Structure formats: structure tokens, C-alpha cells
UniProtKB/Swiss-Prot annotation:
This is Cytidylate kinase. GO terms for molecular function: ATP binding; CMP kinase activity; dCMP kinase activity. ATP binds at residues 12-20. One of its GO terms (cellular component) is cytosol. It comes from Photobacterium profundum (strain SS9). Keywords: ATP-binding, Cytoplasm, Kinase, Nucleotide-binding, Transferase. The lineage of its organism: Bacteria, Pseudomonadati, Pseudomonadota, Gammaproteobacteria, Vibrionales.
Amino acid sequence: MSTHAPVITVDGPSGAGKGTLCMLLAEKLGWHLLDSGAIYRVLALAAIHHGVDLESEDVLVPLAAHLDVQFKAEGDLVKVILEGEDVSGELRKEETGMTASKVAALPRVREALLRRQRAFSNAPGLVADGRDMGTVVFPNAIVKIFLDASAEERANRRMNQLQQKGLDVNFGSLLSEIQERDDRDRNRSVAPLRPAEDALVLDSTDMSIEQVTAQAFAYIEQALEQKS
């Protein structure tokens, strides 16, 4: 991991707006982008492409350590490039998700992916999106942000997204799913979801993405000025 490239971490629960904020910050700063939530799916896809044994840590660890992946912000989307190929669509397939769950359960694979994520820290800088970026992966990040929103607001945003795709969804079911995931993430024994002690906590419940980005960027500019 580069010791000179500055890192900005954005952690928080699902649906708080981390992905959009990170993409906008990376574009504004001209920095690299890491979507840590996609990294296990990327590894799963690489394993499927290479036809390797999904239960063999001896095979998966070197694959994880040398994972050739890039995250590129384009418009309002993040493109995921695996070994030179845009795999953004494939990442969303059910098979990829199921395989990701299997490989994520292997301790040595998790350790290899932790090191691989840290290797994203290259000049001019990195914006890292996740749940434990500021607490575990990049504890020395120059700026740490914890982006939150009420479960009800996050369920409402998700419902609007799905309805725009023409899907019929139930608000109560979405809210229950989000609350259950929050409970799992906040109470897990390894890297529970929580703000780093030195993180700026932003509650986006009653804020637009423009307001969130403006507040985050003002904080980042101040931190970068103090560091220079």
C-alpha cells in the first residue's frame, strides 16, 4: 500500500447514498475509486471465468491477491472492469452473488482481499466506499465519513428505484429487509458497521445528494489544506 497517496473513506449502511457520493467525490478530485461491496462478487466472477475450485483457498488466494479490477465512474454509474472487460452487468447475476457468499466465508481469501483493497491506494488518491473502510481497511485515511439515513428513508429510496424500473414492490417488506441487514451488519463479530472515532457523521435523511456532496467536499477541502 502506498504510504503517500491520501485516502478518503465513506462507510455507512445500505441505501444511505455512499456509492453516489463516492463516485461524485472521485470525479471531482480526479482520484481512484474503490467499491469494496463489489470486490467479493468480482472475485467470484473471476473464479467462474477461470473455472477454478470455489472451495480451494490455495487456488482462490492467489487469484484474490492479483485481482485485475478497476472501478470507473462514468456519468451516474460505476463501471467495473475485470481483466479489461466491463462486467458490471454480470456482477448483478444471482450465480455471481451465490458464489460471492461462498468465497467470502473463507478466512484466507478475506485476508488476501483485504491486502488487495489496500493496494488500491495509489496517487493521486483514493475514495473508498464500504462498511469498514475507515475502521479496518484504511484506519489511517486522511478523511473518514460515515453516511447514514433512517431505515424508512432508505427503504423509500429503494422503493422509488425499483418502481422506476417498472417493478411492483412492497414498502413494508423493503423496510424489514433493510432493518434486518442493519442488525446483522451492526452486530457481527468481525468488523461491525460503526463510524470510526474520527469520522464525520452525515445524516442524509433530509438532504439531497447535492447537499451531502457539498458538505462532504467542504470537509475534505479543509482536511487536505491542513495536511498540505
